[in-house]
Curated annotation (Swiss-Prot):
Cytoplasmic side: 1-58, 117-184, 239-248, 320-321, 390-420, 475-480, 527-796
Keywords: Cell membrane, Ion transport, Membrane, Potassium, Potassium transport, Transmembrane, Transmembrane helix, Transport
Transmembrane segments: 59-79, 96-116, 185-205, 218-238, 249-269, 299-319, 322-342, 369-389, 421-441, 454-474, 481-501, 506-526
Annotated Gene Ontology cellular component terms: plasma membrane
Native source organism of the sequence: Arabidopsis thaliana
Main location group: membrane
Sequence segments annotated as region (Disordered): 1-30
MF annotations from Gene Ontology: potassium ion transmembrane transporter activity
Top-level taxonomy: Eukaryota, Viridiplantae, Streptophyta, Embryophyta, Tracheophyta
InterPro entries linked to this entry: K+_transporter, K_trans_C, K_trans_N
Topology versus the membrane: Multi-pass membrane protein
Function, in words: Putative potassium transporter.
Name assigned to this protein: Potassium transporter 10
Length: 796
């Protein structure tokens, strides 16, 4: 193998001499992407499957327990939060019911179920899923570690634009401003923080409202006992989270289905028994009459009506568990009509007994079914809380993958379902805050005010992100985008103006919680970005490394050194710092970059990308491990074993390509022949770059379509496998001598000339977060006896 080999990721890294790429680079690029039109169809693997009617019914039924628990338990507390001071005019009940009906129609049904749910990222929902979609279609990520080889993943899908289109102009506008990228990130973080707030408020208000039913049948019980019962249920709920929902998850759908069946039946009974005239609320005229009667109370009552659509944020965040068609079917056929009947039945009861508004749900239940209904209501409240807690865990995991949250332990609780995870630290924080809110307010009205504030802000964030999705991903006409955005903002800003009146009545709680999490998440991301920029600017020249010779000017001791770095190109500063202070290194050096991509998952066979650095006798490699935001670093993944399997595959494939590189059929082997950048054609002898996509599928895609003539070249390549086999044996021997994981133990400090707020953020907040978060060695399950930390100070 003549000449020098430059380090690269997918053949794309360019250092001082990186512009010279030879014929092997061209071959690699052919191997590293779909070979033909058929292979091109593998891109964007996610396609919603066509289901039989029976399977669709089954999935729709199962989605009730995961997706709709929170939305379904809203009848427990909506009317009391709408009329906290009592009902002064019975006609107000009709106006409030009409508002509830059209709120459920416009927001959950039309906006979320039929529009927002279609904006999923390969079936994944939530604010970070929308952000990942945007990051793939425009360069809006604040950490610029993406590479074009990432786009060849089968799960990486994107669309192209006409240069003069509205989408292309919007894309350039977003990409050309750092402040716009930061604003987009902050918008996503605000939405995420509000959903975390929901993870605190949903269990509090749902369980407290369900437990409050005790006062109806046991009047001697005071509110203090109800709060104690609610706290006991909450402690039990959070304490069993580490078991996961795999064992009891099958109960969720039947519980929620029974809940919807019962509230719909009771609703129909109350309409028939008390006041069938409430059905006139389906006319929007009564909304106009409701506000025409005037008064601030009617406007602020929108904050209570807002609670009728809570749970839509969890609906979108939990979307990954089921196909969109099942979620849509369940809502339109079961959830929507049952909720309309439940609210109409309560309204009919309140028209006759307006003084029962504080416990409207339980008061409207016939006495004979009170206790069964109380048990089902409590169970449904627990299921609703569980769904929101699980959604919070998923969002934290996504934030971790995007570098927006301190490293915390993530536990996979199910062998069957990838999305079922448990985050211990977050679980106990949620429990403490949830108990504090429940015991502190002791009243569902103030918790409801807080809940409404969080939900409406999440809705506003989703609308703004959907506007960009419609432009950049769906490429909708600007008129359609404007229509959707304006209609959504008019409704949501109306609700937002109403909840602002209740900020001092409990609405401040989610704002404080969100502000605290926002500071943590943004400071962590800012510190991570500055660390990455420092590493990029201080990486070592490739010419310097190659100039040291095969021994690197050091003593090469037996063994393998895995040098962990955040850089996907170049030689990291940690390595030069290491060999400067300790003039010895291992016989084989592998630079390991663990990289998170804006995709939901990276298939295991595409996880690792292996490259060679320098000539063969340098024994230096780079391995990029790529993960999506749903992928987990599990103990049973055996990261080190898979890394070496990919390395050995690389060496064999490299040897095979060397065998066919001098043949006259080389262009066929590489699928296509392209002029190399250094002027050497496909039949040239000088090889500047070796880069392969480390999957057996890549090899098969080269070998399978070959002719008889190709077969002879393949045999020739196999006869030259001995070179690759010798190196495999050499590396195996070094592996037996010991593998050492070399990681940077960096201390990040702000420069002396930095502004005051930057010094506070870096020297105190970021430093504190790094001190309490998990070490990288724990995330990758590195044994302590094989770990070598290299201390450094980064001045950013």
């Amino acid at each position: 193998m003549a000449g020098r080999v430059e380090s690269s990721i997918g053949g794309g890294e360019i250092d001082e001499e990186g512009d010279e790429r030879g014929s092997m680079w061209d071959l690699d690029q052919s191997l590293d992407q779909p070979m033909d039109e058929e292979a091109g169809r593998l891109r964007n693997m996610y396609r919603e499957k066509k289901f039989s009617a029976f399977l669709l019914l089954q999935l729709s039924f199962q989605s009730l327990g995961v997706v709709y628990g929170d939305l379904g338990t809203s009848p427990l507390y909506v009317f009391y939060n709408t009329f906290p001071r009592g009902i002064k005019d019975p006609e107000d009940i009709i106006g409030a019911l009409s508002l509830i009906i059209y709120s459920l129609t416009l927001i959950p049904l039309l906006k979320y179920v039929f529009v927002v749910c279609k904006a999923n990222d390969n079936g994944q929902g939530g604010t970070f899923a929308l952000y990942s979609l945007l990051c793939r279609h425009a360069k809006v990520s604040t950490i610029p570690n993406q590479h074009r080889t990432d786009e060849e993943l089968t799960t990486y899908s994107r669309t192209t634009f006409h240069e003069r289109s509205f989408a292309a102009k919007t894309k350039r506008w977003l990409e050309n401003g750092t402040s716009r990228k930061n604003a987009l990130l902050i918008l996503v973080l605000v939405g995420t923080c509000m959903v975390i707030g929901d993870g605190i408020l949903t269990p509090a208000i749902s369980v407290l409202s369900a437990a409050g039913g005790l006062r109806v049948n046991l009047p001697h019980i005071n509110n203090g006992i109800v709060v104690v019962v609610a706290v006991v249920i909450l402690v039990s709920l959070f304490s069993v989270q580490h078991y996961g929902t795999d064992r009891v998850g099958w109960l969720f759908a039947p519980i929620v289905f029974l809940w919807f069946l019962f509230i719909a039946s009771i609703g129909m009974f109350n309409i028939w028994k008390h006041d069938p005239s409430v059905l006139k609320a389906f006319s929007p005229v009564y909304i106009f009459r409701y506000f025409k009667r005037g008064g601030q109370d009617r406007w602020t009552s929108l904050g209570g009506i807002m609670l009728s659509i809570t749970g839509i944020e969890a609906l979108f965040a939990d979307l990954s568990h089921f196909p969109v068609s099942a979620v849509q079917f369940a809502f339109t056929v079961i959830v929507f009509p049952c909720l309309l009947l439940a609210y109409s039945g309560q309204a009919a009861y309140l028209r006759k007994y307006p003084h029962h508004v504080e416990d409207a749900f339980y008061q409207s239940i016939p006495k004979r079914v009170y206790w069964p209904m109380f048990i089902i209501a409590t169970a449904a409240a627990i299921v609703a809380s569980q769904a929101t807690i699980s959604a919070t865990f998923s969002l934290i995991k996504q934030a971790l993958a995007h570098g927006c949250f301190p490293r915390v332990k993530v536990v996979h609780t199910s062998r069957k379902f990838l999305g079922q995870i448990y985050v211990p630290d977050i679980n106990w924080i949620l429990m403490i805050l949830c108990i504090a809110v429940t015991a502190g307010f002791k009243n569902q009205n103030q918790i409801g005010n807080a809940y409404g504030t969080a939900v409406v802000i999440v809705m506003l964030v989703t609308t703004l992100l959907m506007m960009l999705i419609m432009i950049l991903v769906w490429r909708c006409h600007w008129v359609l985008v404007l229509l959707f955005t304006l209609l959504s903002l008019v409704v949501e800003c109306t609700y937002f103006s109403a909840v602002l009146f209740k900020v001092n009545q409990g609405g401040w709680v989610p704002l404080v919680i969100a502000a605290a999490f926002l500071v943590i998440m943004y400071v962590w991301h800012y510190g991570t970005l500055k660390r990455y920029e420092f590493e990029m600017h201080s990486k070592v020249s490739m010419a310097w490394i190659l100039g040291l010779g095969p021994s690197l000017g050091l003593v090469r001791v037996p063994g393998i050194g895995l040098v962990y770095t955040e850089l996907a190109s170049g030689v990291p500063h940690i390595f030069s710092h290491f060999i400067t202070n300790l003039p010895a290194t291992h016989s084989v050096v592998i630079f390991v970059c663990v990289k998170n991509l804006p995709v939901y998952t990276v298939p295991q066979e595409e996880r690792f990308l292996v490259k060679r650095i320098g000539p063969k006798n340098f024994h230096m490699f780079r391995c990029v491990a790529r993960y999506g935001y749903r992928d987990l670093h599990k103990k049973d993944d055996d990261f080190e074993k898979r890394l070496f399997e990919s390395l050995f595959l690389f060496l064999r494939l490299e040897s095979m390509m060397e065998g066919c590189s001098d043949s006259e059929d080389y262009s066929v082997c590489g699928s296509q022949q392209r002029q190399s950048r250094d002027g050497v054609n496909g039949n040239g002898n000088e090889i500047r770059n070796v880069s392969t996509f480390d999957t057996f599928d890549s090899i098969e895609s080269v070998i399978a379509p070959t002719t008889t003539k190709r077969t002879s070249h393949t045999v020739t390549g196999s006869s030259q496998m001995s070179g690759g086999g010798d190196e495999v044996e050499f590396i195996n021997g070094c592996r037996d001598a010991g593998v050492v994981h070399i990681m940077g133990n960096t201390v990040v400090r702000a420069r002396r000339e930095a502004r005051f707020y930057k010094r506070i953020a870096i020297d105190y907040v970021y430093a504190f977060l790094r001190k309490i978060c998990r070490e990288n060695s724990a995330i990758f399950n590195v044994p302590q006896e094989s770990l070598l930390n290299v201390g450094q100070i980064f001045y950013v």
